[in-house]
C-alpha cells in the first residue's frame, strides 16, 4: 500500500496487514520505487553483496545469515544459508505472500540450492496466514574456518548450529593451546571442537543436559577428528561434584 500522512502527503510504501499487531511495514520511501519482483531481486542482491563483497564471509564459512529482516530492508523475512541449504523463515504475511519472488531471487544468488521454509505457528496466527512446513531436509555439513559441522534445520534444536558465534569460537581457540577446557551448555559442541581441533587444547569436556544434542556434538567432533568428551548432565550438580 501507499502511505500518506494526515495532510495527504505521500511518505512511503509497504506491507499492510489489518490483522497484525504490526499493521504497517515500511519498505521504501522512494515514490518511484515499485514493490515488484525486481525490487525483491535487488534487495537480495544487495544483502548477498554485503556478505560476499564487503564482509567476505565466503572466505571463512558457507554458513551465514543472508537476509536479516528490517536490517536488509525486507521486513518479516529471515534467510540463513547452511552450505547448499537455504532456510527461509517468514515473520509477516507480506513476505509470505511474495515468497515465489523471494525464492527466485535466492536461486539466482545460490544456484542449485535446496530450500527449507517455515513460519512459527504463533506468527501465522498473529499475521493471519497459513503455511504447513515441509518435512525437515537432510542435514547439511557446513565449513567454518576449516572445521566442519552438521546443521539440521527443522529438527527439535533449531539448526543445531549457531552461526552467529563464529567469531567468538575462533577467538576462544587462540587461548586454548595445551589447556584444559570445560564447555558448559555445549550444545552441538562448537566451542569445544574449536578449542581442541583449532586451538590445540590438551583436554576438552563438553556438558549439556540434552542427550540428543550431544549426539550431534559427537558427530561434529568425529567430522573434525577432535577428541572431545561429552557428558550428559545438569551443569549444577556436575560442577559441585567436580569442585
Named regions from a protein language model:
Residues 67-80, 96-162, 170:
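Non-catalytic substrate-recognition/targeting regions of SAM-dependent transferases
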Residues 1-83, 137:
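Non-catalytic accessory regions of SAM-dependent methyltransferases
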Residues 85-90:
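Carbohydrate-binding surface patches
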Residues 134-243:
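Rossmann-like S-adenosyl-L-methionine
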Residues 38-58, 111-127, 173-199, 209:
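A short, charged
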Residues 36-43, 94, 98-102:
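Short amphipathic alpha-helical segments
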Residues 47, 105-109, 220:
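Conserved short hydrophobic interaction patches
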Amino acid at each position: 500500500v501507499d502511505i500518506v500522512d494526515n495532510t495527504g502527503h505521500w511518505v512511503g510504501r509497504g506491507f499492510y496487514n489489518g490483522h497484525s499487531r504490526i499493521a504497517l511495514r515500511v519498505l521504501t520511501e522512494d515514490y518511484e520505487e515499485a514493490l515488484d519482483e525486481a525490487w525483491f531481486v535487488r534487495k537480495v542482491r544487495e544483502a548477498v553483496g554485503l556478505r560476499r563483497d564487503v564482509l567476505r564471509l565466503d572466505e571463512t564459512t558457507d554458513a551465514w545469515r543472508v537476509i536479516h529482516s528490517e536490517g536488509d530492508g525486507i521486513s518479516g523475512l529471515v534467510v540463513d544459508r547452511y552450505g547448499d541449504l537455504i532456510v527461509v523463515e517468514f515473520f509477516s504475511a507480506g513476505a509470505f505472500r511474495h515468497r515465489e519472488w523471494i525464492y527466485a531471487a535466492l536461486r539466482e544468488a545460490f544456484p542449485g540450492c535446496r530450500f527449507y521454509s517455515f513460519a512459527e505457528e504463533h506468527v501465522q496466527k498473529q499475521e493471519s496466514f497459513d503455511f504447513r512446513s515441509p518435512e525437515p531436509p537432510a542435514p547439511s555439513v557446513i565449513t567454518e574456518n576449516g572445521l566442519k559441522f552438521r546443521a539440521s534445520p527443522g529438527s527439535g534444536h533449531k539448526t543445531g548450529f549457531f552461526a552467529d558465534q563464529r567469531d567468538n569460537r575462533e577467538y576462544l581457540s587462540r587461548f586454548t593451546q595445551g589447556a584444559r577446557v570445560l564447555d558448559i551448555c555445549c550444545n552441538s559442541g562448537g566451542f569445544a571442537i574449536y578449542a581442541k581441533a583449532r586451538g590445540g587444547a590438551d583436554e576438552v569436556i563438553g556438558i549439556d543436559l540434552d542427550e540428543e544434542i550431544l549426539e550431534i556434538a559427537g558427530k561434529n567432533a568425529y567430522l573434525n577428528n577432535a577428541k572431545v568428551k561429552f557428558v550428559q548432565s545438569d551443569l549444577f550438580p556436575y560442577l559441585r561434584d567436580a569442585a
